[in-house]
């Protein structure tokens, strides 16, 4: 019988050839330069060298959730350890282990971006009767693409059929009635229900034996940390001044938007956006080449700091070629005022 009790080790070492990438990981792009510019080192900060005191109030932890507690309980423990508000980026059932991104302090606002990033799991399905490998492969392949899924009875959302996307299913091993497989999906897909539906389609029934999330958007289990790492990293920083450990645990908030297409702006445009303006074309320094109208994009300084996120009103080519117009409708601002000076001229 297959077992996932050592799934973190198993996944890290044995599944490299069974990758199930998320759509954003497959996108190819270049960085187009619209305007050659440099950033003033007097303003802002290197996001990967933020003062620890600020990092502890504005960061993300790639936590490996243990089996047993609810996601809410885990977040409460982290909040008590750090002494700052916290939130998680996607609920895991108590018995499910794996990647649970936890945002600290002001970084909690970034969690919404993970909803579109997709998830990846390794699951152990137990069939109620033996089925040929050929039939298992044939049926499971039919669940890749757009599926109709009704949330399970115990879920908190309304029990109505929903269209959801399954990006990839790859079978790792079949041992009698047990099927170990890897699956990547958009957010909101219930793997337990997916397995139930596969069992129904096979005509024998099935249930989920064990589940581990190995990826949530840009966060992967390979660089996840345990609850004890949070405690230890804080101790070594406070007692010994060791920053290396704590910087591996408390990641810059910019790590949480790695899956988004990016636009880098001039120093002179930063304060305007921080104070509520949309991003105008003249403020763009460089950008990803694969931006489409309607994409959720992240706006960054030339140092890499996250300024805001918003909806692209132009594609990359238009942003590069046009001299004026609004390029991005800003939805949420992350940067606090004061890090960059105001450089616009007041009217009237």
From Swiss-Prot:
Q: Which GO terms describe its biological process?
A: box H/ACA sno(s)RNA 3'-end processing; mRNA pseudouridine synthesis; rRNA pseudouridine synthesis; snRNA pseudouridine synthesis; tRNA pseudouridine synthesis
Q: Which InterPro entries match?
A: Dyskerin-like, PsdUridine_synth_cat_dom_sf, PsdUridine_synth_N, PUA, PUA-like_sf, PUA_sf, tRNA_PsdUridine_synth_B_fam, TruB_arch
- SUPFAM superfamilies associated with the record: Pseudouridine synthase (SSF55120), PUA domain-like (SSF88697)
Question: What is the superkingdom listed in this entry's lineage?
Answer: Archaea
Q: Where is the active site?
A: 93 (nucleophile)
Q: Which UniProt keywords apply?
A: Isomerase, tRNA processing
Q: What is its EC number?
A: 5.4.99.25
Q: Describe the location of the PUA domain by residue ranges.
A: 260-335
Task: Write down the chemical reaction(s) this protein catalyses.
Answer: uridine(55) in tRNA = pseudouridine(55) in tRNA
GO molecular function terms noted in the UniProt entry: RNA binding; tRNA pseudouridine(55) synthase activity
Name the CDD domains for this protein.
PseudoU_synth_hDyskerin (cd02572), PUA_Cbf5 (cd21148)
Against Pfam families, the record matches this protein to:
DKCLD, PUA, TruB_C_2, TruB_N
The record's SMART domains line, in alphabetical order, gives: DKCLD, PUA
Name the enzyme's class. isomerase
Q: Does the keyword Zinc apply?
A: no
Question: Cytoplasm: present as a keyword of the record?
Answer: no
Query: What family does the Swiss-Prot or TrEMBL record give for this protein?
Result: Belongs to the pseudouridine synthase TruB family. Type 2 subfamily.
Q: What does this protein do?
A: Could be responsible for synthesis of pseudouridine from uracil-55 in the psi GC loop of transfer RNAs.
> NCBIfam families from the entry?
CBF5 (TIGR00425), PRK04270.1 (NF003280), unchar_dom_2 (TIGR00451)
Name of the protein in its database record: Probable tRNA pseudouridine synthase B
Native species: Nanoarchaeum equitans (strain Kin4-M)
What taxonomic classification does the UniProt entry list for its organism? Archaea, Nanobdellota, Candidatus Nanoarchaeia, Nanoarchaeales, Nanoarchaeaceae
Gene assigned in the entry? truB
